[in-house]
Amino acid sequence: MYRYSNGKISLSDFQQPMGMHLRENNRWVKKVQSIPWDKIEEKYADLFPSETGNVAKPLQLALGACLIQREYGYSDVETVLQIQESPYLQYFCGYAGYDDSKLPFDASSMVHFRKRLTPEVLAQINEMVIQEAQKTEDSDNQDDNKPDGGGNSGTIIVDATCAPSNIRYPQDVSLLNEARENAEKLLDILHSPTDGKKPRTYRKRARKDYLKYVRCRKHTAKMTRKAIGKQLNYLKRDLAAIDGKLNQEKALNIHQTERLETIRKIYEQQKYMYDNHTHSVENRIVSVSQPFVRPIVRGKVGKPVEFGMKLDISVTDGWTRLEYRSFDAYNEATKLQEMIENFHKREGHYPSRVLADKIYRNRENLSYCKARGIRLSGPALGRPKKGEDRNKAQDYRDECERVEVERKFSLGKRKCGMGLVTAKLEETAAHVVALSILLLNLRKIQCAFLQFLDWLLGLLQSREKRMVIQ
């Protein structure tokens, strides 16, 4: 069940020990003011329809702890300790006063927070934060963005990137060795001393063969194929022994059963590539612990292939939104029309222009934009026409403005936790990416406030100089 909190607490009502004075211009104090906690709490309470049972942690504590973790890159245990020790973080998490006598919650609760705050819930929270921030903007700027006479207006910038997961770079031999070790652990669990003699696994010999391969400085194709064949034989024997135990009415729990299915899938894929002398297979598994991760071919310098979630974002007036995400590789050009329609649902009209990379300029997207009066940036398809006079100044401005989405990617990967996703589950990894987008918008609000203070300070200094001169 969920119990509503008493609402946002002002800094003056925050109970502080004698001699402690919190500053109003602290960034965490400003972040509290920029988030519509009451509206978000109404959505969060819908996740707990039951009116009985243990009371869930308040929304401000759950979301605040997740934001703090993304901001600093703390572990679950360190996040709990930092909240216990810092009065600013406690105020951000909705505490009524500073209290360092006990931990705010157990560190394992962070996993439940990430599961409850799904990407869909975080997308709604992100939209509420954007709408709340837009209300405080100058009304003249809002009127300028509205179309006159129901036409198109505004600009949307789109691009795709990959949020890499924290996995070892996959190699066939090391992947098979890890699968073999996991299969041996499952066999140890299924075997009991009353069953008699334990099935032979040759684990010492398999380990010796694996170390012989990895300790070699140069790996030839013949050597690699021989090592893969040996590991496949060892793994085949282990799986046969596990099947024999399961036929004797032995049972595994849910987590162990899922791990066994992953091992079987790895064996099938590696056996197929070994028999057919190929290095590619559909839905290839690259990690035993995270079987949902897929290789994403990016073609970037230094990183031709990344392993993690691929995502599309859109930037409108500096506000970032997560449009699409998937662990499977896909062509981002197929999602452009969906992103434009999402813009139409939010704003009530289509954008006047779309700034995108060349990969988005296919025939379907060009005809779609032309039918709706939208200008898609970039050159036309095919060879340049004879005597064509392109507006180079317009192309240069479009390219300069399109760089904003690259800045969002850079900031999200360097400062918001998108650069290396350490979550182990598919749902929690998606939570990390969605929360990074929310943190990007909170940083934008904070930077806008600091710019306003600099402008106000400069205005006051100029007035003082005028008074001194007079």
For each feature predicted by the language model, list its residue ranges.
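Charged, often Cys/His-bearing segments associated with DNA-binding zinc-finger transcription factors
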Residues: 1-35, 447-470
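Basic, short loop/linker segments at the boundary and entry of helix-turn-helix/winged-helix-like folds
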Residues: 22-67
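Short, conserved catalytic/metal-binding motifs centered on acidic residues
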Residues: 26, 65, 79-83, 104-110, ...
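Trp/Phe/Arg-rich N-terminal binding region typifying the photolyase-homology
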Residues: 47-59, 72-115, 122
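Acidic, metal-coordinating catalytic cores used for nucleic-acid/nucleotide bond scission
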Residues: 52-57, 87, 355-363, 383
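Active-site- or DNA-interface-adjacent structural scaffold in DNA-acting proteins
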Residues: 96-290
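Basic, amphipathic alpha-helical segments enriched in Lys/Arg and hydrophobic/aromatic residues
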Residues: 256-260, 267-274, 393-470
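Electropositive, glycine- and tryptophan-enriched low-complexity nucleic-acid-binding patches
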Residues: 300-346
